[in-house]
Amino acid sequence: MGQKVNPIGIRLGIIKDWNSKWFAGKRYAEFLIQDIKLRSDLKKKLMAAAVSKILIERPANNAVVTILTARPGVIIGKKGGGIETLRKEISDSLGVPVHLNIEEVKKPELDATLVAEGIAQQLEQRVMFRRAMKRAVTSALKAGAKGIKICVSGRLGGAEIARSEWYREGRVPLHTFRADIDYGTAESKTTYGIIGVKVWIFKGEILPQKKRSTESAQ
C-alpha cells in the first residue's frame, strides 16, 4: 500500500530549508536532544501565542533562536519584559548566550501547523469536525491558497469505531518538488480519545534557487 512521505522533508535542499542549522560532529546527539526539548518546552509555554515554527542556529559559541508566531505581542509582553525572561530561560537550557528573534506570521490561515492546531482546538471545544474542516478550507482559500487538504482521524463524533475523514479543495500536487506545500499536524485530546489532524496547503510553485540564478544569468 502506498505511503506518503513528509512533504517538507522531501523538499529540503530543493525549495525548503532546515529548521535547525548547525554542525556538531561528536556532539550531534546532544545538540539534537537539546533542540527537540527546547521546541517542546517552548510550544507548551507559548501555547497562547500560536507558534508556527522555531528555528535554531548555532554559530560558534552562541545560538540564534527565531520564533515564528501569529501573536508576537503575547511573547514580547509589556515593554518587552516577556522576551528578556524567555531569552534567559533559553540561554540556561542551551548553556550558551542566545540571541532571540520574534517574527510575525502575516497570514496564519496559510500556515499548515496553525491551521491544524486551530482545528484541534475546535474539536476539543466539541465543534463538529466537518464544520471545523470546512471553516479552515474556506479561510485558507480566501487568504490566497491554491489548494488545501485536511485529514482528521480518530473516534469522530464519539463513534465506536475510529475512522479518517478527508476534505480537499483546489490542487495539492505532492509529487511536484517545486510546489510550495506546507504541512502541519496536531492532536486533539477529546473525552473519547485523541483525534489526529493533518493539513497540507499548496501556496504556488517556486523555482529552485540554482535554476533561477542560471536562468537570470542567461
Swiss-Prot record:
Whether Cytoplasm counts among this entry's keywords is no
- What GO terms are given for molecular function? mRNA binding; rRNA binding; structural constituent of ribosome
What does the record list as GO biological process? translation
Q: Which GO terms describe its cellular component?
A: cytosolic small ribosomal subunit
| Residues of the KH type-2 domain | 38-106
Annotated InterPro entries = KH_dom, KH_dom-like_a/b, KH_dom_type_2, KH_sf_prok-type, Ribosomal_S3_C_sf, Ribosomal_uS3_bac-typ, Ribosomal_uS3_C, Ribosomal_uS3_CS
PANTHER family noted in UniProt? 30S/40S RIBOSOMAL PROTEIN S3 (PTHR11760), SMALL RIBOSOMAL SUBUNIT PROTEIN US3C (PTHR11760:SF19)
**Similarity comment:** Belongs to the universal ribosomal protein uS3 family.
| Name of the molecule in the record | Small ribosomal subunit protein uS3
